[in-house]
C-alpha cells in the first residue's frame, strides 16, 4: 500500500497547522476588534 505513510505525515501536520491557523485567526480577530 503506497498510502500507508500518509497518516503518519498528515496527523502531525494537522495537529500543528490547525491550532496555528485557529490561534492566528483568533488573534487577528481580537486585534481588529480592539482597533475598531
Curated annotation (Swiss-Prot):
Biological processes, Gene Ontology terms: photosynthesis
Its membrane topology: Single-pass membrane protein
UniProt main location, coarse: plastid
Cross-referenced SUPFAM superfamilies: Subunit VIII of photosystem I reaction centre, PsaI
Bilayer-crossing regions: 7-29
Domain of life: Eukaryota
Keywords recorded for this protein, A-Z: Chloroplast, Membrane, Photosynthesis, Photosystem I, Plastid, Thylakoid, Transmembrane, Transmembrane helix
UniProt keyword Transport, yes or no: no
One Gene Ontology cellular component: chloroplast thylakoid membrane
Similarity comment: Belongs to the PsaI family.
UniProt protein name: Photosystem I reaction center subunit VIII
Organism: Adiantum capillus-veneris (Maidenhair fern)
